[in-house]
A protein has these predicted regions:
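Beta-strand repeat architectures
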Residues: 19-28, 39-48, 59-67, 78-85, ...
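Short Fe-S-cluster ligation motifs
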Residues: 88
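Leucine-rich repeat
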Residues: 57, 76-77, 95, 100, ...
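Feature marks extracellular polysaccharide-active and adherence modules
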Residues: 32-34, 53-55, 62-63, 72-74, ...
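Intrinsically disordered, low-complexity terminal regions
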Residues: 1-40, 110, 127-129, 134-135, ...
Length: 227
């Protein structure tokens, strides 16, 4: 089913997707003329396939559950924020805070992601085929972040148990973030994520893993300058 945002209001489109017609049971949608609208496809809770033809604004696919969403363009701040499950695939670049606070699902970004990618992530898997900006992975708690390019300043600042895999250069590490060894389980998981993102030209062994040194979990006066 085609949903044209030049003919329909954003509220009408989101309401239709949030309340699927059980009799018609159409679960394949194409959204045209998004023209930078904010909160497109926010709050979806059921299995469906959506293709957004164009650029979108803030919080696209926020709070997503189960839906498979492809964006043929760039996205603004907070794509897939607080996502619970499903898959969001950005064919272009992403602005700041991509995948922020998300608990699950898979976010794929074909281009670059700006600052704070994966901030406070809580279980989502994020794959960025380009590079990420500063403070990416800040206070991230669990899940995996894969970056095929470079990472900006303060990567993984104050993170908990997220695994961050970087293939390129890291400008600097944030507080309590250190390079860690890759074991067989990490390599297996990373190869799986690369496969899911249809990345065939890189192998897991070409990445470095970063994680928490676990020195800031509890307050220690010796570490006060790092808090």
């Amino acid at each position: 089913m085609k949903l044209d945002l030049k003919k329909l209001k954003l509220r009408e489109v989101n309401e239709k997707l949030q309340n699927l017609d059980r009799k018609q049971n159409d679960r394949n949608f194409t959204i045209t003329n998004p023209e930078g609208n904010h909160a497109v496809c926010a709050g979806l809770t059921e299995e469906m396939n959506i293709n957004i033809k164009g650029h979108v604004g803030y919080y696209c696919a926020g709070m997503n559950q189960k839906a498979q969403i492809i964006i043929d363009g760039n996205v603004g701040t907070g794509v897939a924020e607080n996502m619970m499950s499903g898959k969001v695939h950005v064919k272009g670049n992403a602005s700041q805070s991509a995948g922020a606070t998300a608990h699950g699902g898979l976010l794929i970004i074909d281009g670059n992601a700006s600052s704070r990618c994966g901030i406070s992530m809580k279980g989502i898997d994020i794959v960025v085929k380009g590079s990420v900006g500063h403070m990416s992975g800040f206070m991230s708690q669990s899940g995996n972040m894969v970056v095929c390019g470079d990472a900006g300043e303060a990567l993984g600042d104050s993170l908990y148990e997220t695994n961050i895999y970087i293939r390129g250069k890291v400008k600097s590490l944030g507080a309590d973030c250190v390079e860690k060894k890759m074991d067989k389980n990490h390599i297996k998981k990373l190869n799986l994520l690369l496969k899911e993102a249809n990345i065939k030209n890189y192998k897991a062994e070409s990445f470095k893993r970063y994680g928490s040194a676990r020195k800031l979990y509890n307050f220690k006066i010796d570490n006060v300058s790092s808090y």
